[in-house]
């Protein structure tokens, strides 16, 4: 499976844009429409598998909640474990947490303390890169547990929101299958 312009265009075209959601002036990129299209969904996972299959990852970490939809099938296809990063109080075993800043306020993410070890080479997966706060916090969680993380994959990137710039200092190789301009 080759990451060519036709494949990437099919993925991008399967993502619906919803104007003025969740508030006026926002163009919401709805990745759930991609999930409704089995050809686009399968192609998305297939392209990620092809890109990462020879890189020696031992775990895929997906962020709540749509990162699960791409991270879990990717991990399954790569034959490695999947680790969820969730909002507080959603994981049953002992966790560590990391807070991060949002446009208005802050949020917190958690991971099980025994989910990542210093032997793990981790790929982080989410549906969307916007401001980069979620991925920054996720990478900090993984590194705090001793995991090696230098790659993050996204279906969508919104470069105008500054996520790539925010993550420049984190020594991450970023892959986005498609970009959309604007907010």
Curated annotation (Swiss-Prot):
Catalysis performed (reactions): AMP + diphosphate = 5-phospho-alpha-D-ribose 1-diphosphate + adenine
Keyword Kinase found: no
Localization of this protein: Cytoplasm
Keywords: Cytoplasm, Glycosyltransferase, Purine salvage, Transferase
One of the Pfam families matching this protein, by short name: Pribosyltran
Role according to the record: Catalyzes a salvage reaction resulting in the formation of AMP, that is energically less costly than de novo synthesis.
Entry protein name: Adenine phosphoribosyltransferase
Gene that specifies this protein: apt
């Amino acid at each position: 499976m080759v990451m060519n312009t036709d494949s990437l265009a099919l993925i991008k075209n399967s993502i619906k844009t919803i104007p003025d959601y969740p508030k006026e002036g926002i163009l919401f990129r709805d990745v759930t429409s991609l999930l409704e299209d089995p050809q686009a969904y399968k192609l998305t996972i297939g392209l990620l598998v092809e890109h990462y299959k020879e890189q020696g990852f031992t775990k895929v970490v997906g962020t709540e909640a749509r990162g699960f939809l791409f991270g879990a099938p990717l991990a399954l296809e790569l034959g490695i474990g999947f680790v969820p990063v969730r909002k507080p109080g959603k994981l049953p075993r002992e966790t560590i947490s990391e807070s991060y800043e949002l446009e208005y306020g802050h949020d917190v993410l958690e991971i099980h303390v025994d989910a990542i070890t210093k032997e793990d080479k981790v790929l982080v997966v989410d549906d969307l890169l916007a401001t980069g706060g979620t991925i920054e916090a996720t990478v900090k969680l993984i590194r705090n547990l001793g995991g090696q993380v230098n790659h993050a994959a996204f279906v969508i990137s919104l470069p105008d929101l500054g996520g790539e710039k925010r993550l420049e200092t984190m020594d991450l190789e970023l892959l986005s299958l498609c970009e959309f301009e604007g907010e």
